[in-house]
Amino acid sequence: MHFVEKEPDQKRIDFDQKLKSNKILRIPGAYNPLTAKLIEEIGYDAVYVSGGVMANDLGFPDIGLTTLQDVSTRSYLISRVTNLPTIVDIDTGFKSVSYTHLTLPTILRV
């Protein structure tokens, strides 16, 4: 399997620089690693992982049934095949505001 050269921290720095450029960014959605690779090869600026599309791909309606593990695992599989920054829809944050201390570090490792 193809792994990328850039670590998540470098991808975040790159994305921050793109945001500061004040240019319109093109960020299509990817629901699997192959789509993410194609997005990078075509020349887009980043990859978006949709919570709704991910839920549907797992066989769930988009009503908050995916877990943090579902989202972090799928997002990791997608982000590891591209040097582009990956924006992940973490839906409702999984459970409550007090759960944020687990959600954010988990997703930031993606």
Per-region residue spans from a language model:
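Alpha-helix-loop-beta-strand connector modules within alpha/beta enzyme cores
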Residues: 62-88
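N-terminal amphipathic alpha-helix/helix-capping segment at the start of soluble metabolic enzymes
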Residues: 1-29, 38
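Hydrophobic faces of well-ordered beta-strands that scaffold small-molecule active sites
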Residues: 26-29, 47-49, 86-90
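Glycine-rich, proline-tolerant flexible connector loops at the mouths of alpha/beta enzymes
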Residues: 48-70, 92-96
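Conserved, mostly hydrophobic/aromatic
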Residues: 32, 39, 89
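Short, well-ordered coil/turn segments that N-cap beta-strands
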Residues: 22-25, 44-45, 82-84
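Conserved small/polar residues in nucleotide/adenosyl-binding loops
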Residues: 100-106
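Catalytic domains of carbohydrate-active enzymes, especially glycoside hydrolases
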Residues: 38-47
